[in-house]
């Protein structure tokens, strides 16, 4: 009996070894993507890319690989990474024929289902996405933004006041920016002021946002190798997703309270949604809550990251910081003059924000797509069907093929009259993506960043604490940046 068991086990082991070896040989030499360059381990097995992503090294490795292999890199047996400007349009741009469209990778977005079972706008198919986006878009028009300016400004003023109360003591600006951005987006969504800034420690809902994204990305990579993925995901979410469910349920309660008011003259997002009366477009309550939760998660995390990165790189580059601070205080004699209309005309402020979005993109990772059954022409190359493809933002923005002195913070590169950067591939820079699934809140993000940054520099002398110089350089990524505390001082302005 023991002999039979031993023989059977040996046969199974040998069969497994043969299967693994055959798969590796096929992936390297015979797979439809075999001709594309990339690391041998990545071409041989998806385990390598899954490991790289799970430990937070994906973006650093992508940059290294693109520098080594060029504009197209095979980062897994069935996946290609791009870092060129033309690839943006080829992958994410709008296609006239449905059969030519690259769809979102269903595995990557399988976790984009809210606890109520509803998929948010980021994960639904094209038709539902178009319907939901057309409804939400009413809350993001220029007219809506003009009406929302006073609300954003009130939150910025409160941030300034709270920082003034510190009297120049060192503080973790990452936490402040997360609380500030969460207050703004939550107030815009629900018409309620949650005052996360008033929390002495991390405001739990704000922390859940980026912790949930980080843990979710790791889980999705692990699930690539597990059968019955959807069932396993549901079990794990039920077992370990308590904080996420509580956060979502709180959002549902606030949304339901706001809906009961049924008032459409406010400036919050729900008021604009309620004005859409076309029955074919109206959102169900479960769709509304799932997408409001998405707006809060996406809006608070990315804006907080943008502001943290911008303040960090400005404080590292004192000449630019002093120039921008002087310009703000010279052009605007009173705090009340810092309006969106006035700030939009300030070129240096715009250049600083653009450069911050390049060197420290709030979403540094790849948004994966699948090529259609007919394949797809990307970067002038025919890519086989059912291939995972995507632009890696960090690798694209830090490539010396795209930007001169790519690792240096130089806002002047965005000045069209600067010959030094005339060969920069500026069309590569798409921090809000593009096409029909590009960021809906782009203008709102710009408005919040402009107002917040301008008011902080107008009111304070910003100083980076010693020992914080490598804050960005040592960060890992799990789709978003894993931000350590960033200690800075906001001293009352001296002139």
UniProtKB/Swiss-Prot annotation:
GO molecular function, one term: iron ion binding
Cofactor: heme
Claim: Ribosomal protein is one of the keywords in the record: no
Membrane topology, from the record: Single-pass membrane protein
GO BP annotations, alphabetical order: biosynthetic process
Pfam family, one: p450
Record's keyword terms, sorted: Glycoprotein, Heme, Iron, Membrane, Metal-binding, Monooxygenase, Oxidoreductase, Transmembrane, Transmembrane helix
TM regions (residue ranges): 12-32
Subcellular location: Membrane
GO cellular component: a single term: membrane
Keyword Metal-binding: yes
Pathway: Mycotoxin biosynthesis
UniProt: heme binding residues: 439
EC number: 1.-.-.-
Main subcellular location: membrane
Annotated glycosylation sites: 249, 317
PANTHER family, per the entry: CYTOCHROME P450, CYTOCHROME P450 MONOOXYGENASE ASQL-RELATED
Function recorded in the entry: Cytochrome P450 monooxygenase; part of the gene cluster that mediates the biosynthesis of the diterpene glucoside brassicicene C. In the first step of the brassicicene C biosynthesis, the bifunctional diterpene synthase bsc8 that possesses both prenyl transferase and terpene cyclase activity, converts isopentenyl diphosphate and dimethylallyl diphosphate into geranylgeranyl diphosphate (GGDP) that is further converted into fusicocca-2,10(14)-diene, the first precursor for brassicicene C.
Family classification: Belongs to the cytochrome P450 family.
Protein name per UniProt: Fusicoccadiene 8-ol C-16 hydroxylase
Source organism per UniProt: Alternaria brassicicola
Gene: bsc7
């Amino acid at each position: 009996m023991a002999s039979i068991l031993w023989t059977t086990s040996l046969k199974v082991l040998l069969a497994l070894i043969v299967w693994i070896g055959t798969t590796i040989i096929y992936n390297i030499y015979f797979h439809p993507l075999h001709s594309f360059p990339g690391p041998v381990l990545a071409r041989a097995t998806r385990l390598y890319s899954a490991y790289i992503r799970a430990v937070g090294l994906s973006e650093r490795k992508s940059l290294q690989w693109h520098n080594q292999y060029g504009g197209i890199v095979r980062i897994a047996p069935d996946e290609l990474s791009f870092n060129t400007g033309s690839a943006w349009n080829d992958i994410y741009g709008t296609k006239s024929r449905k059969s030519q469209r690259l769809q979102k990778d269903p595995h990557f977005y399988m976790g984009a289902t809210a606890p109520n079972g509803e998929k948010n706008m980021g994960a639904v198919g094209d038709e539902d996405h178009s319907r939901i986006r057309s409804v939400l878009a009413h809350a993001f028009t220029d007219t809506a933004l003009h009406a929302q300016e006073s609300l954003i400004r009130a939150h910025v003023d409160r941030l300034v006041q709270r920082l003034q109360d510190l009297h120049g003591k060192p503080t973790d600006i990452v936490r402040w920016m997360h609380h500030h951005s969460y207050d703004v987006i939550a107030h815009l969504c629900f018409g309620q002021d949650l005052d996360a800034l008033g929390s002495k420690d991390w405001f739990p809902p704000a922390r859940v946002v980026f912790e949930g994204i980080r843990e979710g990305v790791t889980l999705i990579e692990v699930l690539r190798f597990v059968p019955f993925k959807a069932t396993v995901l549901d079990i794990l979410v039920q077992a370990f997703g308590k904080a996420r469910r509580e956060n979502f349920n709180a959002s549902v309660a606030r949304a339901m309270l706001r809906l009961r008011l049924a008032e459409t003259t406010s400036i919050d997002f729900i008021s604009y949604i309620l004005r859409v009366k076309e029955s074919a477009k109206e959102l169900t309550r479960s769709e509304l809550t799932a997408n409001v939760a998405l707006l809060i998660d996406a809006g608070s995390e990315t804006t907080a990251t943008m502001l943290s990165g911008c303040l960090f790189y400005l404080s590292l580059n004192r000449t630019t910081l002093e120039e921008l601070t002087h310009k703000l205080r010279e052009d605007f004699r009173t705090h009340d003059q810092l309006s969106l209309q006035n700030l939009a005309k300030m070129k240096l402020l715009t250049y600083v924000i653009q450069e911050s979005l390049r060197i420290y993109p709030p979403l540094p990772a790849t948004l994966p797509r699948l090529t259609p059954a007919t394949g797809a022409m990307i970067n002038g190359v025919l890519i086989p069907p059912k291939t995972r493809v995507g632009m890696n933002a960090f690798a694209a923005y830090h490539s010396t093929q795209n930007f001169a002195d790519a690792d240096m913070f130089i806002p002047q590169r965005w000045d069209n009259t600067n010959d030094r950067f005339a060969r920069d591939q500026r069309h590569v820079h798409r921090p809000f993506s593009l096409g029909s699934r590009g960021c809906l809140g782009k203008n709102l993000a710009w408005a919040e960043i402009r107002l917040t940054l301008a008011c902080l520099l107008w009111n304070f002398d910003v100083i980076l604490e010693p020992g914080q110089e490598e804050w960005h350089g040592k960060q890992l990524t799990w789709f978003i940046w894993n931000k350590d505390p960033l200690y800075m001082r906001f001293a009352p302005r001296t002139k």
